[in-house]
Design a protein with these regions (language model features):
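Flexible "cap/lid" loop of the alpha/beta hydrolase fold
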Residues: 4-53
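Conserved serine/cysteine hydrolase catalytic core
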Residues: 87-147, 153
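Conserved alpha/beta-hydrolase catalytic His-Asp/Glu region
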Residues: 29-38, 50-112
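A structural preference for long, well-packed, hydrophobic secondary-structure segments
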Residues: 1-8, 13, 26-27, 59-73, ...
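Nucleotide-sugar donor-binding loop of glycosyltransferases
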Residues: 22, 125, 156
Length: 171
């Protein structure tokens, strides 16, 4: 989302290519065929009932880290490391960042980017069944690469960097 936000704010003039990681340009949609972050009800619950305290944020990130972000079974110290990093952001800012992401709509910008710049979308394996067809249909200019969980660059740095370097070498 940050890449598309940058393009919205500053344009594409200084860009030679775009890489995005495992996020739909339209994270919230009532259409079940679209790649979203969850149902409207699920996302509403997270925003209004979960991310309302430090403890709620910690529990959310713990569940998200073990279920979505990382594929391997983490040891307690690795999970604690990730929770410590996320816990440095106050819960009210986490909530605002979550809502800002969920309610964003960069679909038209993402389409334009894919049509005019070399573009690579990394997709987490757990999303590939819906995300890959979504990107192929809605963002046909994007190359896609499926690997890992949401934190694929953390969990598989050599493989991720190799794919990134191959993309950058073509620019």
């Amino acid at each position: 989302l940050d890449t598309w936000s940058y393009v919205q704010q500053f344009g594409k003039d200084k860009l030679r290519g775009v890489v995005t990681i495992d996020m739909s340009p339209l994270p919230l949609s009532p259409d079940p065929k679209w790649w979203t972050e969850g149902t409207i009800e699920e996302l509403s619950q997270v925003a209004t009932q979960v991310l309302t305290s430090s403890q709620g944020c910690r529990e959310f990130f713990s569940e998200y880290a073990t279920g979505v972000m990382i594929q391997h079974k983490m040891k307690p110290d690795e999970l604690e490391y990730l929770l410590d990093i996320s816990g440095r952001t106050p819960y009210w800012i986490c909530r605002q960042l979550f809502c800002d992401a969920v309610f964003s709509n960069y679909l038209e910008i993402a389409k334009d980017v894919g049509a005019t710049l070399p573009s690579l979308m990394f997709i987490a394996e757990h999303w590939q069944g819906i995300a890959k067809p979504f990107v192929e249909a809605q963002l046909p200019g994007y190359d896609t690469y499926v690997m890992g969980g949401h934190l694929m660059f953390y969990e598989y740095p050599e493989k991720w960097n190799r794919v990134l370097e191959d993309f950058l070498d073509k620019l």
